[in-house]
Amino acid sequence: VADSLGYSYNLISDNLSIYSRYPIIRKYAFADSISTFNFGGVMIDVDGKPVRVFNTWLHYLPDMRLAPTDKSKEEILAWEMEGTRDEEIHKILSVLQPLLAEADSIPIIMGGDFNVHSHLDWTEATRNLYLHGGAVVDWPVSIAMEEAGFKDSFREMNPNPVANLGVTWLTDADSLETECRMDRIDFIYYQGKTIQAIASECYDNSLGKTFTFKGEDFFYPSDHGFVLSKFELK
């Protein structure tokens, strides 16, 4: 695919890869601290400006579709902490610390399948919408990203989750026996003084179905939707 488009390509692992229309000038892996199955990245040259781009995958369990929204906030968070996502994101943020210190001169974009909701979506305003079951939840992974200085590009550009929740998962709910939430678990975060999101949209589709994009029909190859964010470098 990369060769046919004339793109640069980095295979981080059999789970993660990065395609870039801009030259890749450096690759990053932190295998001693976090598996390349979960995280890795590159530095690209955007018309003479370096940008660090990272791809992320956090574990899919516990399954967000089964979040016990009828329980208390404390019980929901205890359920979430039974998995490894919180541990994984803190390992990732730990290895990124030297690069985060340079983010104002070399901006960072960090995207991927985080397999967990965002506290920016599970608010007082949405508690009785989207099958949230009355729950308002400070999901730990998105809180950790925010505390590390990252901005959620989609929610920054679409600040009202009531008007635009942004769905990247579970378009296939009709195939399930019980009603399931369709929610946002894929994100593009960014950080740095010289980068600014100027547009962001979530596109929702299902594996194997036809997807129409920019007037063309495509076979859709993923069980997730995707986020498309546009950035301006200053």
Each model region followed by its residue ranges:
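A structural motif
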Residues: 46-72, 111-120, 150, 154
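His/acidic metal-ligating clusters that form di-metal
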Residues: 45, 52, 81-114
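A solvent-exposed, charged loop/short amphipathic helix patch at secondary-structure junctions
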Residues: 63-83, 125
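Structured beta-strand-rich core segments of catalytic domains in phosphoester-bond hydrolases
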Residues: 1-67, 202
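Stable alpha-helical elements in mature extracytoplasmic
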Residues: 1, 15, 85-95, 137-141
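Sec-exported extracytoplasmic/periplasmic mature domains
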Residues: 2-6, 21-24, 97-101, 146-150
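Metal-dependent phosphoester-hydrolase catalytic domains
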Residues: 98-108, 116-234
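A short acidic, glycine-rich active-site loop
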Residues: 76-86, 130-136
